[in-house]
Amino acid sequence: MKKILLALAALTLAASAQFSTIDNDTLLKMQAQGTPVIDIRTPGEWSTTGIIKGSHKMMFFNEKGQPDMGNWFFELGHLIKDKDQPFIVYCAHANRSKALGQFLDKQLGFKNVYELKGGIEHGWIPAGKPVVK
């Protein structure tokens, strides 16, 4: 009985985990269907590499690596209307976006948060996908 309860608990946790990593083509498909894409990098990074066309520039971590949560969540509230609405976050290498996505999912209850595999520098650009400056 104990094993059954543990298995059910594990399945429940797995079913409720909504944060996931997506590839470039999935991002394009979701974006074409209206899913917002958010670039959480810094202005310096945006100017160096460009951004994915149609992305919303919403810096989460400043140049010193400190989060700017108040401003970011203010901006997010204008873009994302409820915690069930899907959206995609990305950064340079997927480290910051993964940390943010997991936080949004596990701590704040956002149900459909996605992050771009490899970020813009290790996933998007090497695959030959376009950027805009």
Q: Where are these predicted regions, by residue range?
A:
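Sec-dependent N-terminal signal peptides
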Residues: 3-13
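Structural scaffold elements adjacent to functional motifs in cytosolic proteins
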Residues: 37-39
